[in-house]
């Protein structure tokens, strides 16, 4: 969407958040809704969670505070991919000086992202970030009227994909624990707040895209549009300048129509031992999300062998929570180094 030409009613535009593990189809969901005429979104960044501790309680926004907000925004990892125009974005922010909410100021930032897709009569802003899967409770407090689209993928296929792209240490037990952790949290929240959550499986979306996209549109009360499936025709335009050449491999799926080519990869890509580790760690939660286990019998010995990696996975969340209470500038610097830590652990494991 182009820079806001005039002050608009931001309270009339709601937020929804796309939740899911990395390599679970979250980017596909974001792309479908970026292509929808009544919805806008932007590349993942996560600035809302990062900036809320410092700005969440601000109710009176002066020019100085708004400029400071923008400058702090630009410290966030990946915000450079948005290619925001500083002067135009600040000009837009200044339209909302005075009494206003943190929520609305965040919306102004999204409205300044220039998508290659047209938009009009915008009803929703969508924000997608894999880290949000474990921040849903906090997001509900920040945006009380927000809703959530939660997408899951067969955890064994998810492990294959993450191992391929080296997002995290390529250990089946660790990746299974991470899948289990976020899935349990979101399952419980969905049970407690059923109207706020819509769950979809990547496998169902890939197999019957029209059916399940229409269901999501009905949930959001926006018209279903077949043209969203033409997103891949603008792939080059969308990725040019917004994705580092080395990262293009992560977005190959955006170059093609939705397909089922990535379903069931685990059957040939994972070793039998890795499958056993994954299914032992995740246990019944696979069935709770509609995925059938190959090995249903609990293996205590295997679980004990996986325990160190589960504890390591738990420690990552503890460290992240510590980061979140640190001063903003320190927090951002540490979060910028997060991928380096994951890469370091991955290299050590390979050795």
Per-region residue spans from a language model:
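Short, conserved clusters of charged catalytic residues that mark active-site
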Residues: 13-14, 24, 108, 131-134, ...
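PAPS-dependent sulfation machinery
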Residues: 41-127, 132
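PAPS-dependent sulfotransferase catalytic domain
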Residues: 113-256
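Amphipathic alpha-helical recognition patches that constitute DNA-binding helices
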Residues: 17, 28, 147
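A conserved segment at the C-terminal end of the G1
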Residues: 27-38
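Catalytic donor-sugar/metal-binding loop of nucleotide-sugar-dependent glycosyltransferases
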Residues: 37-41, 147
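PAPS-dependent sulfotransferases, especially Golgi type II membrane carbohydrate sulfotransferases
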Residues: 1-17, 190, 218, 222-351
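P-loop (Walker A) phosphate-binding loop of NTP-binding proteins
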Residues: 21
């Amino acid at each position: 969407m182009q820079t806001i030409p005039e002050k608009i009613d931001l309270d009339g535009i709601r937020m929804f958040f796309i939740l899911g593990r990395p390599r679970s189809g979250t980017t596909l969901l974001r792309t479908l809704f970026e292509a929808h005429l009544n919805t806008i979104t932007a590349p993942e960044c996560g600035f809302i969670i990062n900036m809320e501790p410092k700005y969440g309680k601000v109710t009176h926004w002066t020019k100085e505070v708004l400029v400071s907000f923008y400058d702090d925004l630009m410290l966030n990892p990946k915000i450079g991919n948005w290619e925001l125009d500083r002067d135009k974005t600040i000009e837009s922010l200044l339209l909302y000086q005075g009494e206003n909410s943190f929520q609305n100021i965040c919306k102004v930032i999204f409205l300044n992202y220039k998508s290659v897709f047209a938009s009009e009569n915008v009803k929703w802003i969508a924000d997608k970030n894999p880290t949000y899967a474990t921040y849903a409770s906090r997001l509900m407090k920040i945006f009380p009227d927000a809703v959530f689209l939660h997408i899951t993928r067969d955890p064994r296929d998810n492990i294959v994909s993450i191992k391929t792209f080296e997002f995290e240490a390529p250990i089946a037990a660790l990746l299974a624990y991470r899948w289990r952790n976020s899935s349990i949290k979101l399952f419980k929240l969905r049970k407690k707040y059923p109207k706020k959550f819509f769950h979809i499986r990547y496998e169902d979306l890939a197999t019957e895209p029209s059916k399940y996209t229409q269901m999501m549109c009905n949930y959001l009360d926006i018209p279903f549009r077949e043209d969203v499936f033409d997103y891949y025709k603008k792939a080059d335009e969308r990725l040019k300048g917004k994705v580092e050449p080395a990262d293009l491999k992560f977005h190959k799926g955006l170059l093609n129509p939705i397909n089922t080519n990535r379903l069931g990869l685990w059957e040939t890509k994972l070793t039998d031992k890795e499958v056993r580790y994954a299914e032992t760690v995740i246990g019944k939660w696979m069935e709770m999300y509609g995925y059938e286990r190959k090995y249903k019998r609990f293996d205590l010995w295997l679980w004990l062998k996986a325990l160190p990696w589960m504890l390591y996975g738990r420690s990552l969340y503890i460290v992240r929570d510590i980061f979140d209470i640190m001063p903003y500038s320190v927090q951002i610097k540490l979060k910028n180094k997060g991928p380096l830590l994951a890469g370091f652990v991955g290299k050590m494991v390979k050795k």
